[in-house]
């Protein structure tokens, strides 16, 4: 691909020039208010630069094409299945050499309570707490539980913690035959870990090996990372500390959503809360070239107005605020590489730039992120547009999540776009849309939960995509 195709007007043109506009015939310049005429003396290369914007086209190779085909075909033959194994990822062949952690190293290198790690504290769970019933006992025979209290408390943990611990136990037996995983501490009801600890919520475990061989602990920490723990710390020579996200936030890994009160701009110029959007509404989106365009909402990948959810909230210097689930893809402008990419929301940092709509000109321009915070709110809405993108609260974002490739995710939803097109051709559907007895938003109101196709894609992603391509 010609390198000029990937160049960006606001990076290559003078700083006063902007070419992201809903009206492609206009060129806005602070030095001149005149319009660019078709016969103006603009070199062909400059015209080409002005026609192409921001979004770096990644030509899919053979592997990407094969994965896209699998994403298209496998969901159509999807059927539910039950497994006797401890969880996802069990029994996989190790694909690369693993290196042990060093003392005091943590993965990820973030604070434990950030959304990119195990997430915020939700409060201690006591035996008389309503949340106590959410803790599950772990009777895995491949795990030794020290249980110093003699109450069985160390066997209690969150569902996600149990799943990851069982995967780790299997890995330990494969790595060191005859050695088992030792859990020294899990859920703690005696408050022996300071004021703030995920042990009080059943979301943390302190582990070692049954032979107490400290030379193994660096690799044990690495195996815990591979097992899927959200935060792992080689905190001491005597043990490893691991923690996970809360079970209530697991849905943020299944899908990507916005809050219902976030707004989208309709084609008529009216802002509408996402919770009130209807299938068929045309909302402001962004093309693959980075141009603003209005696109039809064809379905809701998730819609649940009563679900509590953890979100990442991004604040920009211009005053835009986007609230989105951690695994959602958001457009990020990379000035050092002069390209526009899509990044998981919980990996966006302060001083990075996102695309924000200018209210006066309608253009999409980079705006610096000045604050990133974790919040908890009620309700999730995930509209899917035909373009696969949507501008929410003036910030350009993807409609997709979990997979770190916008183009591959868009390929995966191609059957739904085709189905929507075929349905639009049916006369009966046109009659239903025009009838007052069948309001246009009835299908959205009936949906409560994840769309069946999106759920099918989530279930197969672990088998067709490398771990590095997924949000874990």
UniProtKB/Swiss-Prot annotation:
EC number: 3.1.-.-
Lipid attachment site numbers (Cholesterol glycine ester): 256
Sites marked Essential for auto-cleavage: 328
Lipid anchor positions (N-palmitoyl cysteine): 84
Keywords for the protein's UniProt record, in alphabetical order: Autocatalytic cleavage, Calcium, Cell membrane, Cytoplasm, Developmental protein, Hydrolase, Lipoprotein, Membrane, Metal-binding, Morphogen, Nucleus, Palmitate, Protease, Segmentation polarity protein, Signal, Transferase
GO biological process terms, semicolon-separated: anatomical structure morphogenesis; cell fate specification; cell-cell signaling; intein-mediated protein splicing; protein autoprocessing; regulation of gene expression; segment polarity determination; self proteolysis
Binding site for Ca(2+) 1: 149, 154, 185
Gene3D superfamilies assigned to the protein according to its UniProt record, in alphabetical order: 3.30.1380.10, Hedgehog/Intein (Hint) domain (2.170.16.10)
Gene Ontology molecular function terms on file: calcium ion binding; cholesterol-protein transferase activity; morphogen activity; patched binding; peptidase activity
Family: Belongs to the hedgehog family.
Protein name per Swiss-Prot or TrEMBL: Protein hedgehog
Organism this protein belongs to: Drosophila ananassae (Fruit fly)
Name of the gene this protein is made from: hh
């Amino acid at each position: 691909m010609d390198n000029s195709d990937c160049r960006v007007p606001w990076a290559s043109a003078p700083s006063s020039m902007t070419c992201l506009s809903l009206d492609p015939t206009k060129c806005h310049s602070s030095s001149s208010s005149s319009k660019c005429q078709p016969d103006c003396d603009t070199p062909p290369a400059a015209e080409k630069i002005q026609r192409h914007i921001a979004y770096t086209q990644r030509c899919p190779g053979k592997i990407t094409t094969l994965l896209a085909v699998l994403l298209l075909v496998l969901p159509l033959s999807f059927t539910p299945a039950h497994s006797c194994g401890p969880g996802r990822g069990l029994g996989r062949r190790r694909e690369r050499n693993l290196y042990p952690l060093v003392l005091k190293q943590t993965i990820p290198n973030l604070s434990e309570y950030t959304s990119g790690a195990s997430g915020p504290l939700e409060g201690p769970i006591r035996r008389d707490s309503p949340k106590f019933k959410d803790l599950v006992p772990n009777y895995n025979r491949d795990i030794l539980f020290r249980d110093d209290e003699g109450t069985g408390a160390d066997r209690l943990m969150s569902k996600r913690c149990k799943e990851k611990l069982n995967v780790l136990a299997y890995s330990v037996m494969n790595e060191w035959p005859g050695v088992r995983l030792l859990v020294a501490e899990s859920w703690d009801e005696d408050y022996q870990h300071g004021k703030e600890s995920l042990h009080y919520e059943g979301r943390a475990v302190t582990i070692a090996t049954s032979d107490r061989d400290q030379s193994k602990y660096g690799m044990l920490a690495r195996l815990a990372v591979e097992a899927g723990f959200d935060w792992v710390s080689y905190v001491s020579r005597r043990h490893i500390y691991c923690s996970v996200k809360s079970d209530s936030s697991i849905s943020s890994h299944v899908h990507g959503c916005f809050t219902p009160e976030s707004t989208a701009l309709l084609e008529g110029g009216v802002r509408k809360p996402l919770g009130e959007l209807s299938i068929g509404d045309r909302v402001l989106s962004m093309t693959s070239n980075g141009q603003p365009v209005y696109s039809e909402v064809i379905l809701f990948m998730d819609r649940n107005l009563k679900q509590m959810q953890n979100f990442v909230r991004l604040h920009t210097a211009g005053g835009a605020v986007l609230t989105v689930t951690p695994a959602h893809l958001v457009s990020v402008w990379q000035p050092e590489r002069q390209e526009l990419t899509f990044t998981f929301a919980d990996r966006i940092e302060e001083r990075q730039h996102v695309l924000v709509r200018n209210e006066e000109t309608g253009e999409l321009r980079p705006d610096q992120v000045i604050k990133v915070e974790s919040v908890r709110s009620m309700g999730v809405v995930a509209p899917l547009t035909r373009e696969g993108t949507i501008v929410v609260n003036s910030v350009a974002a993807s409609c997709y999540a979990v997979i770190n490739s916008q183009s591959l995710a868009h390929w995966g939803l191609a059957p739904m776009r085709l189905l929507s097109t075929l349905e639009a051709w049916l006369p009966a559907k046109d009659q239903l849309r025009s009838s007052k007895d069948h309001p246009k938003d009835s299908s959205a109101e009936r949906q409560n939960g994840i769309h069946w196709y999106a759920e099918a894609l989530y279930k197969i992603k672990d088998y067709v995509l490398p771990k590095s391509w997924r949000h874990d």
